Amino acid sequence: ITVCRPSWLYGPRDRASLPRLINAVQNRKAKIIGRGDNRLNLTYAGNEAEGCILAAEHPDAVGQAYNLSNDGIITQAEYFNKIAEAIGAKPVTRRVPYPVAQRAAFLMELTGHMFGRKKPPLVTRYAVWLMGRKCFFSCEKARQQLNWQPTVSYDEGIRRSIAWCRENGLA
């Protein structure tokens, strides 16, 4: 058995988190949680797939576990603003403290359940947790043992993801 551990995946065919984030940025409803300087560990889905294929085919990968994530550092504020730039929206500058965001998400989830809404709320507690945490996983082992390199940058991955969402009427 070989284990590939993705960090937070994004890319085409994401029908959940990215379309909601794109729409929130476009409609000026997105807020940076906390200071926005926390590092996100995002992985473009195509980069993850390439790493998994390499791990599946490499004879020395049996019994190993690999973290797979994009190159470089991207903070929450940078991620939001790369999306804003890619869709031609204004930068996201409004902020909300983490505890306030958690409580607001809880209330949005609760209201949705109470009124039987089919669509998920704009923000969930899980989304707040993902966006608000500080996170870094080294993928050096995958680089060394599998000769894996992420081939799609943050900018290109965001561009492709937004294009797919638009083509499919999700943003």
Language model features: what each stretch is:
Residues 1-12:
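Conserved beta-loop-beta element that borders a ligand/cofactor-binding pocket
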Residues 20-42, 92-135:
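Alpha-helical membrane-targeting segments
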Residues 11, 33-38, 66-73, 84-87, ...:
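Glycine-rich Rossmann NAD(P)(H)-binding loop
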Residues 54, 58-122, 139, 159-162:
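Mid/C-terminal beta-alpha module of Rossmann-like enzyme folds, strongest
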Residues 137, 141-144, 149, 153-171:
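Amphipathic terminal alpha-helices
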